Amino acid sequence: MSRAKFERKKPHVNIGTIGHVDHGKTTLTAAITMTLAAAGGSVGKKYDEIDSAPEEKARGITINTAHVEYETEKRHYAHVDCPGHADYVKNMITGAAQMDGAILVVSGADGPMPQTKEHILLAKQVGVPNVVVFLNKEDQVDDKELLELVELEVRETLDKYEFPGDEIPVVPGSALLALEALIENPKTQRGENKWVDKIYQLMDNVDSYIPTPQRETDKPFLLAVEDVLSITGRGTVATGRVERGALRISDNVEIVGLRPTQTAVVTGLEMFKKTLDETLAGDNVGVLLRGVQKKDIERGMVIAKPGTITPHTKFEAQVYVLTKEEGGRHSAFMIGYQPQFYVRTTDVTGKVVGFNHIQMRNPSSVAEEHSNKMAMPGDRISMTVELINPIAIEKGMRFAIREGGRTVGAGVVTNIVQ
């Protein structure tokens, strides 16, 4: 059996379901695949096929995530659903599954709950740009006014975390009743069942409200240097993977991080021992540079389009601290902790200079007392970090925290201080 070819006929968008435990994220994911399967746009997946999510490793952390794919008339989607709350936190912070938009699932019977708020906050901080709401379990709410109150509360919560609460589409429905109708008759089409129609209505909103993302190739060029070689008579070659953008021969570039920024000219590009005229996002390339010595470049610097990235030493970040079971620390750490911050291709020593907020793994009144003074394994924290050397950092960038070569945390930059 040969592999099916991935055909790029429609724009591709990455989305995911977020929301409080038991509000119906996985049921909705199953209902979407079954609905669109009836329209010929996906392979239907039942609840238990999605719920038994396989483990993945991202930045040294094990995460359970289920990936499904489906198509609407307009787009091709890759959809991620995580079974456990901790998996969401880890997924969003490590960027294991990047989301261009999210479907926030809120039970109409319960309204926004603590994890609803935490997921919205996380989505905001890790840069999920757009959200569409599915107000689930509509069949369990007898009073229409009650449902309207829940919708209002959801919109206010979104506003509070700086999403446009008034504009965001909110679609009421019942994922379970839609799923049951589709299991009974897998060929149910649009217009044949009230609950299945709500799923179509939700996907119409996802199609129209969540914009197609800008492709990595259209962004300004950036390559993280992995290795540096010197070719006698030709110059210096830096190798690495192109993170974004495109680069051509004779382009000017800046070499940023660890030392004062330098400029150079690209005189050649090589991949798989062949020369190229242009390199694109995702390529592993060797860039031949004129105007710099081998000693001037080292692993951990980046080569970028001039003026697009600057070196920094101090930033704020959202961090997930690994538990002992995940191979992390066995004990808490305080302000003043000095681990290595692994950014792109290198470790840089840094110091935790402040905790801004700690979402504890096991909140209790006693724990609240010392909450902003120490971080325990399993906590999610917002912290301020100061590095000993300036490196190219930008908002939304992911990193790992390491100690003696092992990963003890994962983070995402939420704000640059200096």
Curated annotation (Swiss-Prot):
The keyword DNA-binding does not apply. Mg(2+) binds at T26. Residues 19-26 are annotated as: G1. It comes from the Eukaryota. Pfam families: GTP_EFTU, GTP_EFTU_D2, GTP_EFTU_D3. Its EC number is 3.6.5.3. It catalyses: GTP + H2O = GDP + phosphate + H(+). GO terms for biological process: mitochondrial translational elongation. InterPro entries: EF-Tu_GTP-bd, EF-Tu_GTPase, EFTu-like_2, EFTU_2, G_TR_CS, P-loop_NTPase, Small_GTP-bd, T_Tr_GTP-bd_dom. Residues 60-64 are annotated as: G2. Its main location: plastid. It is an enzyme of class 3 (hydrolase). Residues 136-139 are annotated as: G4. The keyword Repressor does not apply. Keywords: Chloroplast, Elongation factor, GTP-binding, Hydrolase, Magnesium, Metal-binding, Nucleotide-binding, Plastid, Protein biosynthesis. GO terms for cellular component: chloroplast; mitochondrion. Residues 174-176 are annotated as: G5. It is found in: Plastid, Chloroplast. GO terms for molecular function: GTP binding; GTPase activity; translation elongation factor activity. Belongs to the TRAFAC class translation factor GTPase superfamily. Classic translation factor GTPase family. EF-Tu/EF-1A subfamily. This is Elongation factor Tu, chloroplastic. The gene is tufA.
